[in-house]
Amino acid sequence: MASRAGSARRAPENEATIQYVQCDGLAVMKIVKHCHEESCSNMEVAQGALLGLVVENRLEITNCFPFPKHDDTMDEEEYQLDMMRRLRRVNVDHFHVGWYQSADVGNFLSLSLLESQYHYQTSIEESVVVIYDTKKSARGFLTLKAYRLTPQAIAMYKEGDYTPEALRNLKIGYENLFIEVPIVIRNSPLTNIMISELTEMIPEEEGSKFLDLGTASVLEGQLRSLMERVDELNQEAIKFNRYQQLVVRQQQDKHRWMVKRAQENAARAAKDETPLPEEDVNKLFKPHPVPPRLNPMIVAGQIDTYSQHISQFCSQSLAKLYLTQALQNAKEAKQNN
C-alpha cells in the first residue's frame, strides 16, 4: 500500500483546508460492493483507490476502483496508472484523492494503515482514507467514515523515533493519531426520487426487525478479539518491564564500577602510583535498545475501540430486552383478558 501513493501528484506540505468530504452515491455503492464481495471470500481487508477533485473547502469523491489482490507477477503502480488512464479516456475524474479500506466492527487501526496514509498524505496533500465497516453495515447501520493523519502523527513518522520520550514530547497517543473528516453522500435529484419511491414500496413488516435478539455471535466475536488484543498488550508490557529492569541493573553496575575505580585510584595516589586510565563508561556498559512503543499504542487503540463497541452493543441489547419483555407482558395480559 505504501508504494501506491508514489505515482500520485505531489502537493506542497502546508496544512490542508479540507472541511468535509462529499462522496457520490455511485462511488459509495462500488465501495460497498467491493468490500462485501471480499469479506465473503475470506479476504482480510478490501482496498481501493478514490478518484475525484478538490472544490474550495470540500473533497469530492466521484469514482473509485479496487486494488488487485497481492500478486508477485503484477506491478501495482502500473495497474493503478493504467486504470487512471482508462478512466480519463471516458471523461471520468481521474485525480487520485485517497484510498478506501474495509474494517471489522470499526477497528481499522493498524501499522500498515498508518504507514500507507502517511505516504498518501505526504504525496497528496488533500488525501483521505475512507473506512467502510462491513459487519456493522450488514446489520443495517451504514458506517462510512473519512480520516486524515494529525500533524503530530506526521511529525512522528518523519522523525521515525517511537521511544516513550519522543512520543511524550509530541504529546501523541492513539486518541490523536487520526482526525475524522465529516463525510456526506450526494445523489442526483432523480436518484433521491427513486429511493423515496422504493421506500414506499417496502412492506411495513419488512422493516420491523428492530427487536432482533439473535446477536450472540456478534458479541462473541468482539469479546474474542478484545481478549486477543489484551493478551498482545500484556506481552508488550512484559517486554517493556524487562527493558526497564535491565536499565536499572545496568545503572547499578555502572555506579559500582565507578566507585570501585575511584577507590583504586585513591589507593594508588596514596602510594604515589599513576592512576588507572579513565575508560569510557559507555563502551563498557552499552545502553540497551529502547523497544518501540508504536505497536503497543496501536494495540491500546484497538482495545479502546472494541470496548466502546461492546459497551454500545450491550446497551442496545439491554434496551431491546426490556422492550421485548414489556411487549410480551402486554401480549400475555391481553390474551388473559
From Swiss-Prot:
GO terms for cellular component: eukaryotic 43S preinitiation complex; eukaryotic 48S preinitiation complex; eukaryotic translation initiation factor 3 complex. This is Eukaryotic translation initiation factor 3 subunit H. It comes from Bombyx mori. It is found in: Cytoplasm. Residues 21-153 form the MPN domain. GO terms for biological process: formation of cytoplasmic translation initiation complex. Component of the eukaryotic translation initiation factor 3 (eIF-3) complex. Component of the eukaryotic translation initiation factor 3 (eIF-3) complex, which is involved in protein synthesis of a specialized repertoire of mRNAs and, together with other initiation factors, stimulates binding of mRNA and methionyl-tRNAi to the 40S ribosome. The eIF-3 complex specifically targets and initiates translation of a subset of mRNAs involved in cell proliferation.
